[in-house]
Amino acid sequence: MKAILLVLLCTFAATNADTLCIGYHANNSTDTVDTVLEKNVTVTHSVNLLEDRHNGKLCKLGGIAPLHLGKCNIAGRLLGNPECELLLTVSSWSYIVETSKSDNGTCYPGDFINYEELREQLSSVSSFERFEIFPKTSSWPNHETNRGVTAACPYAGANSFYRNLIWLVKKENSYPKLSKSYVNNKGKEVLVLWGIHHPPTSTDQQSLYQNADAYVFVGSSKYNRKFKPEIAARPKVRGQAGRMSYYWTLIEPGDTITFEATGNLVVPRYAFAMNRGSGSGIIIWDAPVHDCNTKCQTPKGAINTSLPFQNIHPVTIGECPKYVKSTKLRMATGLRNVPSIQSRGLFGAIAGFIEGGWTGMIDGWYGYHHQNEQGSGYAADQRSTQNAIDGITNKVNSVIEKMNTQFTAVGKEFNHLEKRIENLNKKVDDGFLDIWTYNAELLVLLENERTLDFHDSNVKNLYEKVRSQLRNNAKEIGNGCFEFYHKCDDTCMESVKNGTYDYPKYSEESKLNREEIDGVKLESTRIYQILAIYSTVASSLVLLVSLGAISFWMCSNGSLQCRICI
């Protein structure tokens, strides 16, 4: 009876002791992140680094409308196809839009030499000045400038020709040698285009140019080429058996371009002084331009985001996130989200000893739960929480700043003869893309691992801070909790939390209570030992008596014979 009373006394004393627990925040978040060692770790807070949403529209870029070519393409716009006349007045744009129906290009059949390279050049041009490089009325007095029209380039039901070129033919059965130069005084690159006509027969050659053995020479400091017309019978295209070859070059500021010819020259009338801009580009999409504004445009739609990565489209124009193949890039900022009713699973408790977080602590990441005669409650440790928030915020901002080098990525142009180069280029681009995706994913995995370890370390440091103050004035009872050997009111609890706990003040009370509890435990242990001895002896006597009774019964009925020899 005495033992039972002592045990009850010990239990009663333990139940009414004041306690202080170290813990961490938990909430109802379902955000998951990946680390180097784990996948789909639920965390209290995280930030998404990957943009996967767009508006599905073509928008203005930085408030500037794009140049929508409609049924025209780049060639038609630059040569001045009569069907593209409405586009001639547009001098600036944010980017260029072609459609799958942009068929109005070279109306007179022929080849546009290095057309893909010209498109690539224009992908970095945001505006140009269209100016008359060789005035029509004064530049060619000895040649006919109005007869060079064709049914292949109709306008308003009549034969016409490109608005930016002049098809020179003979005048009064004479085509004297021409020589004309232009000096670039625009202070910027000037794009100049011209053409060479290839008649189908010698008769056509003489009818148009009089000279049977004509030539064309075009030269500048960087471009020098002599052309000879290729007279040959060809199948008709757009009603024409002849062909034209279209050429272009860029004239640097201060440079001179010279045209010399005895026939077959389609001379430039207008040229283009170009202003380059890194945010321009060419998009092929059938959508119209909407009344919206964006900083980043893709062929799938506009992106308005400050995130460093996107997985929408590799071709972008404007201030755009980097394209990666990833489907998820989420960076942890908070702790592992493990409410106390759940198990931590394979990797155990946070900080190695606390089994669950507190949903009741909402004003910080780390903190305390106390219980004493005045009540109980949660309180966040503001200093450690704020230090952690500042550190993680700076880290996230640094990662985003380093990775958020916004740029324009345009598709590269290749013609059908350069298919092998195009395929090789795609392989190289895919290789770089794979490497960039791997680097981005690895960065996030490593930073998530460091963040979660950082939180674990902060909780453990907070626990050690409390333990170093309390020393033997309290005992560790597991799961991050301390049980005081003395009464600890709210003022006492607050002193522990803010690091001003007065250990000597409570040492004597703690010593007495500790010795009393230890004495109760010792007395209880001795009584249990005596009871165990008595129980063992009694059990042995009962066993011996039982064996004797069985033996006597068996001897009496003959089942067991006993012989005593002397």
Swiss-Prot record:
Secretion signal span: 1-17
UniProt-listed GO biological process terms: clathrin-dependent endocytosis of virus by host cell; fusion of virus membrane with host endosome membrane; fusion of virus membrane with host plasma membrane; viral budding from plasma membrane; virion attachment to host cell
GO MF assignments: host cell surface receptor binding
Paired cysteines (S-S): 21-481, 59-292, 72-84, 107-153, 296-320, 488-492
Gene3D superfamilies to which the protein is assigned, alphabetical: 3.90.20.10, 3.90.209.20, Hemagglutinin Chain A, Domain 2 (2.10.77.10)
Topology feature Cytoplasmic, residues: 551-566
Note from the entry: Major glycoprotein, comprises over 80% of the envelope proteins present in virus particle. The extent of infection into host organism is determined by HA. Influenza viruses bud from the apical surface of polarized epithelial cells (e.g. bronchial epithelial cells) into lumen of lungs and are therefore usually pneumotropic. The reason is that HA is cleaved by tryptase clara which is restricted to lungs. However, HAs of H5 and H7 pantropic avian viruses subtypes can be cleaved by furin and subtilisin-type enzymes, allowing the virus to grow in other organs than lungs.
Family: Belongs to the influenza viruses hemagglutinin family.
Protein name according to UniProt: Hemagglutinin
Species the sequence originates in: Influenza A virus (strain A/Swine/New Jersey/11/1976 H1N1)
Name of encoding gene: HA
